[in-house]
Curated annotation (Swiss-Prot):
Coiled-coil annotated spans: none
Induction: Expressed in the late phase of the viral replicative cycle.
GO biological process, one term: symbiont entry into host cell
SUPFAM superfamilies: Fibre shaft of virus attachment proteins, Virus attachment protein globular domain
Extra facts: All late proteins expressed from the major late promoter are produced by alternative splicing and alternative polyadenylation of the same gene giving rise to non-overlapping ORFs. A leader sequence is present in the N-terminus of all these mRNAs and is recognized by the viral shutoff protein to provide expression although conventional translation via ribosome scanning from the cap has been shut off in the host cell.
The protein's name: Fiber protein
Assembly description: Homotrimer. Interacts with host receptor CD46. Interacts (via N-terminal tail region) with pentons.
Presence of keyword Protein biosynthesis: no
The species this protein was found in: Human adenovirus B serotype 11 (strain Slobiski) (HAdV-11)
Amino acid sequence: MTKRVRLSDSFNPVYPYEDESTSQHPFINPGFISPNGFTQSPNGVLTLKCLTPLTTTGGSLQLKVGGGLTVDDTNGFLKENISATTPLVKTGHSIGLPLGAGLGTNENKLCIKLGQGLTFNSNNICIDDNINTLWTGVNPTEANCQIMNSSESNDCKLILTLVKTGALVTAFVYVIGVSNNFNMLTTHRNINFTAELFFDSTGNLLTRLSSLKTPLNHKSGQNMATGAITNAKGFMPSTTAYPFNDNSREKENYIYGTCYYTASDRTAFPIDISVMLNRRAINDETSYCIRITWSWNTGDAPEVQTSATTLVTSPFTFYYIREDD
């Protein structure tokens, strides 16, 4: 059995148990001291066991906090020490980014929302030139236009291209005969034929009313794009520049020119061409219209009665002031 060291008469039994005569801490280990959470040095000093993030620096038990944490002076709660600067916003315990016009998220990634007329090319934003073009395609595979009143089906191909260039539209047009009835026009000395195009308020072709029976669409390679167009108003002739039913400005609604038909003997026959913009609306559905008339009056017919060939007019280009988008 081990005997304890005899304490001096000047021992103070109150912690820290100093000997008043020597100011020394005798080594004692009373039964009421547990080593859990405490430690006692050989000289009898009782201290707390502190592991990170706890510390007693400054004399009191403290929690070490990094740059992103702080202790609330009001309630003593631990909270994040994070502020947000514009355009970031802090709401509660979250940081967010308000999204303005043109921005969105896709698969939890910030992205740019591209509207009509813009596209990505090798991760760069560029202008989609195709939407500046409205056309029938380079050469439709089948007849797309019915011009002859006597025709029960489409009798020719109308190739039409409309390109927006600033405040103007550049138009490019010609016809290719398909039916024998249409091609026989070349055997007449005096003839005219008209392609009528009627459009609604958004610039969509009214195929039921128009000579052209297939809708126009944007350019996709050498073909028409797929899907319906939402707004082609910017391709239409301006109703301010070319008003409807205004006899005082009738001449301003017409464009005149010449194209040619090359006969089978290689003779070039001139064809008068006139373009009427708006001018007359046939019903309430019609907001815009373009009428293109080809005519000739020659001493001799381009072809003889027995040798009618495909009627192909040379391309004709004209310009007009366009409607606002």
